[in-house]
A protein has these predicted regions:
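Short, well-ordered beta-to-alpha junction loops that form the rim of enzyme active sites
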Residues: 8, 156-160
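Glycine-rich, anion-gripping cofactor-binding loops and their flanking helix/strand elements
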Residues: 1-62, 167-175
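Phosphate/pyrophosphate-binding active-site segments
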Residues: 58-157
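Short gly/pro/ser/thr-enriched loop/turn and capping motifs at secondary-structure boundaries
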Residues: 11-16, 46, 68-72, 89, ...
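A sequence-level detector of short, solvent-exposed, charge-rich linear segments
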Residues: 16, 24, 53-57, 80, ...
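Generic recognition of flexible, low-complexity loop/linker segments
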Residues: 26-27, 49-51, 140-143, 150, ...
Length: 175
């Protein structure tokens, strides 16, 4: 599927960060610009700003879940589909495959994601800033040298989460 994907705490790891559709570094931009959001088996909670139009300015929501409770909390979807998410997304994919739609925004958001990662990784991390404080990227750069490949990454606390999403390359990650 060529559909941009954002994960949350509940779904982290379902689609690897290396997948070209995972646009974790473009989270804010994607949420504010999306015209369609498909929620698969999850509630609209604080991680998604409860679906607030202040964040999701133009978005329509399709909500798919095996649980009726997940379909009706907060902002309602149109449609709301009570189904196994895997089955529903496969049917949607089959229908979209027959469509000819403009993928300009999809390509733009993926490029934005890659550029943002590059910008963060290209910053000189071994120096302190003008305020003599450490660059948060240095933390993750140093961690790469001491952790195993299959470590479980956990990040908590405000701004550090933005840096962790880009710098903490963990197969298993929780924030």
């Amino acid at each position: 599927y060529n559909i941009p994907y954002l994960d949350t705490q509940d779904s982290r790891g379902l689609i690897p960060q290396s997948n070209s559709n995972n646009i974790f570094a473009a989270r804010s931009k994607a949420m504010s610009e999306a015209d369609l959001v498909i929620l698969l088996g999850r509630k609209l909670d604080y991680q998604l700003a409860f679906g607030s139009p202040a964040v999701f300015k133009e978005a329509k929501f399709i909500r798919i879940s095996e649980s009726a409770l997940e379909l009706t909390d907060n902002r309602r979807g149109f449609p709301e589909i009570l189904s196994d998410p895997g089955v529903a997304i496969e049917l949607i994919h089959n229908k979209l495959n027959k469509s000819n739609f403009d993928e300009t925004w999809i390509n733009d958001i993926k490029n934005f994601h890659l550029e943002k990662i590059k910008k963060v990784l290209d910053k000189e991390v071994n120096k302190t800033g003008d305020d003599n404080k450490i660059n948060p990227n240095l933390i993750f750069e140093k961690l790469k040298n001491i952790i195993d490949e299959d470590f479980i990454g956990i990040a908590d606390g405000g701004d550090i989460l933005s840096f962790a999403r880009v710098g903490l390359h963990s197969k298993y990650y929780i924030d």
